[in-house]
């Protein structure tokens, strides 16, 4: 009986060994000669200057960051940059200049959409006349910028304050963008503005932006009649501080492809600003006034050359 059981065990082991061989032969092999095509995916974005990849010290504010600052003019936002001195020559409508490393305003160039701005009247750029309503990005470069495609004046300056305006962007199925704002504040401040963007075709876009601001600027101050603590004082209002400005911009944008863009921009600005003086011997009369009219047209063409 034991021999029969042993014989059956050997037969069972022999059958299991030889019957398992065809099971391995039935496994499917991967066909490595076949080519599988993956659909093409195109990802596009607008080039923006970033602090993390800049070789020179760079500070910038995006449009979202400028909204959080609650600033009215470019001069108000520039004060939040580190290592910058914004000189204010008095009054709401006074001249406001920017300097880096205490080198003076003449060593800091102000660029508007990549074009250097000049002022033959004073030799210094008044950054108080630029509004933030049409600004997309505000950057300050301490030293040479990483952008090699810029005017020679940018390379010869100690710092660059670059103002980039908004480029029209449209959502899918939308061809018109209209934005209006109205701001008001103390001392008679009234500041309405409007922005219109229209897509003429897939390649051509036009935009127009206008702004008007008015303020009497008659803020109160305390006039002391002597240096002693018990001397008489009176509350006065600053005179000759009225400001009225008007700004208009129009732009034509050509987006021929992802590697070829062209823009044409026209800018006009005029202002009437009173310049108050210090109260000397209780005399607060001032009649000095400043009128400005600035206009320029600039064009920019940016092709991307490949296969060099």
Where are these regions (language model features)?
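N-terminal periplasmic "start-of-domain" segments of outer-membrane beta-barrel proteins
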Residues: 37-67, 97
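Surface-exposed beta-strand-turn/loop segments characteristic
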Residues: 207-244
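Outer-envelope beta-barrel architecture signal
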Residues: 108, 174-178, 183, 190, ...
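Transmembrane beta-barrel strands of outer-membrane/channel proteins
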Residues: 180-184, 208-214, 264-270
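Hydrophobic, lipid-facing positions within transmembrane beta-strands of outer-membrane proteins
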Residues: 39, 96, 157-159, 176-178, ...
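Flexible loop and strand-edge segments within Gram-negative outer membrane beta-barrel domains
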Residues: 219, 235-247, 253-306
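Extracytoplasmic beta-strand/coil segments of soluble accessory domains associated
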Residues: 75-116
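A beta-strand signature from Gram-negative outer-membrane beta-barrel systems
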Residues: 132-179
């Amino acid at each position: 009986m034991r021999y029969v059981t042993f014989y059956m065990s050997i037969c069972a082991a022999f059958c299991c060994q030889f019957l398992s061989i065809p099971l391995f032969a039935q496994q499917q092999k991967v066909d490595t000669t076949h080519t599988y095509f993956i659909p093409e995916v195109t990802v596009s974005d607008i080039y923006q200057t970033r602090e993390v990849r800049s070789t020179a010290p760079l500070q910038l504010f995006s449009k979202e960051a400028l909204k959080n600052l609650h600033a009215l003019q470019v001069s108000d936002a520039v004060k939040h940059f580190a290592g910058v001195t914004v000189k204010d020559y008095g009054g709401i409508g006074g001249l406001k200049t920017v300097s880096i490393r205490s080198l003076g305003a003449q060593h800091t160039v102000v660029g508007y959409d990549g074009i250097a701005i000049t002022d033959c009247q004073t030799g210094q750029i008044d950054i108080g006349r630029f509004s933030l309503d049409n600004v997309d990005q505000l950057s300050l470069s301490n030293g040479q910028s990483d952008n090699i495609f810029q005017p020679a004046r940018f390379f010869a300056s100690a710092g660059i304050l670059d103002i980039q305006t908004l480029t029209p962007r449209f959502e899918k199925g939308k061809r018109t963008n209209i934005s209006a704002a109205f701001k008001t504040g103390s001392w008679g401040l009234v500041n309405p503005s409007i922005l219109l963007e229209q897509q003429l075709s897939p390649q051509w876009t036009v935009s127009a932006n206008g702004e008007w601001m008015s303020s009497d600027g008659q803020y109160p101050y305390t006039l002391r009649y002597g240096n002693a603590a018990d001397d008489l004082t009176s509350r006065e209002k600053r005179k000759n501080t009225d400001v009225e400005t008007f700004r208009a911009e129009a732009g034509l944008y050509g987006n021929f492809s992802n590697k070829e863009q062209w823009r044409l921009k026209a800018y006009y600005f005029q202002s009437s600003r009173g310049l108050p003086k210090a109260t000397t011997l209780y005399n607060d009369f001032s009649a000095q006034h400043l009128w400005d009219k600035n206009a320029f047209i600039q064009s920019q063409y940016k092709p991307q050359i490949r296969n060099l």
